Amino acid sequence: MSQETILVTGGGGSTAHTTIATLLEQGHRVRAMVRKLDARADTLRDMGAEIVVADMLDIIAVRAAMQGCSAVYFTMSISPNYLEASTNVAVAAKSLGVRAFVNLSQMTVSQMSETETTSSPQQKQHWLAEQMLRWSGLPVVYLRPTAFFDSMFLLQGAKGIREDNVIRLPFADGKTSLIAGADVGAAAAAVLANPAPHIGKVYDLTGLQSLTMAQYAQEFSGVLGRTIQYINVPPQIWEAKLREVQLPAHLIEHLITMGQLHRDNRYDRMTDSFQQLVGRAPISAAEFVRRHAAAFTPQSESSSKATSH
């Protein structure tokens, strides 16, 4: 059991929750940095985490939140301010002399350079943030996951699956090795629990399978017991829909780029990095659907099952 404190930023995010839970179960002290006090923060506090509220764009608040911590897990949702936030956290970590800085990046970065980039401003900022961290001299571990099941199907696709039995995405026949946010969180926890062997290393994290969206639809069908179909949405219609719902411009450009990269088969990659770090295989597509079946099940069907029991 470690008496040192580990700081986890983005405490309300999909990876951070599992990271915090795992570390607490192992007896580590965890400080969760959140943007505001809400139900998610209450849950983390009930689990045993220390809660601190700080804006990552406020370097003074970030440094105060990090005071007394031996390691940092930096994770942040998609934001036009990502590079500034990551720099603030890195500057504070350098000033305070943390012994490990675990950075949650993106797998696309492994195919980027100053001459090879993408159209996504988010991916560009991830690449720049990694350059900054390398120059910083901090003891960094780089986690680069592929796309998440959670964002693909819970945030974007759940309504279409639940109400219309369809997955609508502009990926054509491109394959993607989706990973669960909880698995990424487990990988981060494994590194934070014993960071020394991992300092300076890069881990590209993929899921168990690399499948087309039509094949993912088959996985949904098998678990849910009804036919789920994949509809390949033309890119221009996809872009129009994104703008119609008035998503932030930064996010729209990122999603458009992800669509193109999937059509180009850039997400068809497999590694065993997760197995190396955690000691088990990442969860399958079918297992992800089972764990979140309620999100993909029509309300009437859920009610009838509850009544029958």
Q: Model regions: which residues?
A:
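Structural motif detector for alpha-helix initiation sites
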Residues: 181, 213, 235, 284-285
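Short, conserved active-site loop motifs that form the nucleotide-linked donor/cofactor pocket
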Residues: 48-50, 140
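A hydrophobic C-terminal alpha-helical subdomain
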Residues: 198, 236-309
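Hydrophobic acceptor-binding patch used for acceptor engagement in glycosyltransferases
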Residues: 72
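Contiguous C-terminal substrate-recognition/catalytic subdomains in enzyme active sites
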Residues: 227-231, 299-300
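Oxidoreductase cofactor-interface core, primarily capturing Rossmann-like NAD(P)-dependent enzymes
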Residues: 2-43, 57-60, 64-69, 78-87, ...
